[in-house]
Design a protein with these regions (language model features):
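Mature extracellular/passenger domains of Gram-negative fimbrial/pilin and adhesin proteins
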Residues: 2-8, 19-179
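Hydrophobic helical h-region of N-terminal Sec-dependent signal peptides
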Residues: 10-14
Length: 179
């Protein structure tokens, strides 16, 4: 009986492996190879830039009358220091925290008298190119002598329709990315 059970177990094990051994790549299929690198050290975000507050200009709701309209971009910087010599450049990668999936902008989270049909859009260093949440802004060189860098980005109002007056509060997260 024990011998039969062992033979049955081996036969079943062979059946489960058989499809894998003889499987062939089907037409229209391929592979994806991921390569990366983990760094032992990172730059330190300067104290005043860890939790940054950017005050956008006060504008009339009438200045954002249709979806896609934007307000003037307001500059903000993120500075880092104590960067390891092995790193040559740094950028902010803006997470999908509080993201509108349709626009990939930051939704308005104001709880008291919120403005309607308005979000905050991140903009790259040129003041024109949108940075969609889940993306990385431009990389900035790390100064080898000071082991520091300052990244410059913008935020601006972005209408999702005819806007209504009120408060705007938009919060997202970022992490540092390196090259």
């Amino acid at each position: 009986m024990k011998k039969q059970l062992t033979q049955l177990t081996m036969a079943l094990a062979g059946l489960s492996v058989a499809p894998m051994v003889f499987a062939q790549t089907a037409p229209g299929t391929g592979t994806v190879t991921f390569n990366g690198q983990l760094t032992a050290d990172t730059c330190v975000i300067n104290a005043g830039d860890i939790n940054k507050t950017v005050t956008l200009d006060t504008v009339s709701a009438q200045s954002l009358p249709v979806a896609g309209a934007t307000g003037d971009a307001t500059n903000f910087t993120i500075s880092v220091s104590q960067c390891p010599a092995t790193l040559s450049s740094v950028a902010a990668h803006f997470e999908t925290t509080n993201m509108d999936p349709a626009t990939r902008n930051i939704i308005n989270q104001a709880t008291v008298s919120p403005a309607t049909n308005v979000e905050v859009q991140l903009v790259d260093k040129d003041g024109k190119t949108p940075i969609l949440l889940g993306s990385t802004g431009s990389f900035y060189p790390i100064n080898a002598a000071t082991q520091s860098a300052t990244m410059s980005y913008y935020g601006q109002y972005y209408a999702t329709g005819k806007t209504g007056a009120g408060n705007v509060t938009a919060v997202t997260s970022y992490t540092l990315a390196y090259q």
